[in-house]
Amino acid sequence: MSQTVHFQDNPVTVANVIPQAGSKAQAFTLVAKDLSDVSLSQYAGKRKVLNIFPSIDTGVCAASVRKFNQLATEVENTVVLCVSADLPFAQSRFCGAEGLSNVITLSTLRNNEFLKNYGVEIVDGPLKGLAARAVIVLDENDNVIFSQLVDEITHEPDYDAALNVLKA
């Protein structure tokens, strides 16, 4: 099973299907800025926003990290996990230069299974192997309460929809 999104108006295929509201999030282990392994279970009891994107070195991806850094201050008991294939060094450099301290950057460096399991792996086109742009919101028990696979990778996600779910 696959989905189609667009990159600069050209269709690209995304493997599998993004988790839908009501489903249980799959466990994952990703790489933190200090190169340690971080698992979903480390955020047990907190709501999670998974801001997933191709690379922090693009304008739209960087804008999403900045916006979620701001929104993270508006909701309680919530962590924002910004997930990309970027090396942890690049993620850390970006957040340091931008003064962003309300989000946690995580890399798929040692776990490409995350992309497959979360239905965001681009399998053709110029961004093959990277993540499609998506936002997945989990409750305290890792149940999906919101998900959006952005149809055009060069567009920002629906921040208000994600925030409204957290404020409901």
Curated annotation (Swiss-Prot):
The keyword Disulfide bond applies. Residues 19-168 form the Thioredoxin domain. The keyword Transferase does not apply. The active site is at C61. It catalyses: a hydroperoxide + [thioredoxin]-dithiol = an alcohol + [thioredoxin]-disulfide + H2O. PROSITE patterns: THIOREDOXIN_2, TPX. GO terms for molecular function: thioredoxin peroxidase activity. Its EC number is 1.11.1.24. InterPro entries: Redoxin (IPR013740), Thioredoxin-like_sf (IPR036249), Thioredoxin_domain (IPR013766), TPX (IPR002065), Tpx_CS (IPR018219), Tpx_Peroxidase_subfamily (IPR050455). Disulfide bonds join C61-C95. CDD domains: PRX_Atyp2cys (cd03014). Keywords: Antioxidant, Disulfide bond, Oxidoreductase, Peroxidase, Redox-active center. Homodimer. The active site is a conserved redox-active cysteine residue, the peroxidatic cysteine (C(P)), which makes the nucleophilic attack on the peroxide substrate. The peroxide oxidizes the C(P)-SH to cysteine sulfenic acid (C(P)-SOH), which then reacts with another cysteine residue, the resolving cysteine (C(R)), to form a disulfide bridge. The disulfide is subsequently reduced by an appropriate electron donor to complete the catalytic cycle. In this atypical 2-Cys peroxiredoxin, C(R) is present in the same subunit to form an intramolecular disulfide. Belongs to the peroxiredoxin family. Tpx subfamily. PANTHER family: THIOL PEROXIDASE (PTHR43110:SF1). Thiol-specific peroxidase that catalyzes the reduction of hydrogen peroxide and organic hydroperoxides to water and alcohols, respectively. Plays a role in cell protection against oxidative stress by detoxifying peroxides. This is Thiol peroxidase.
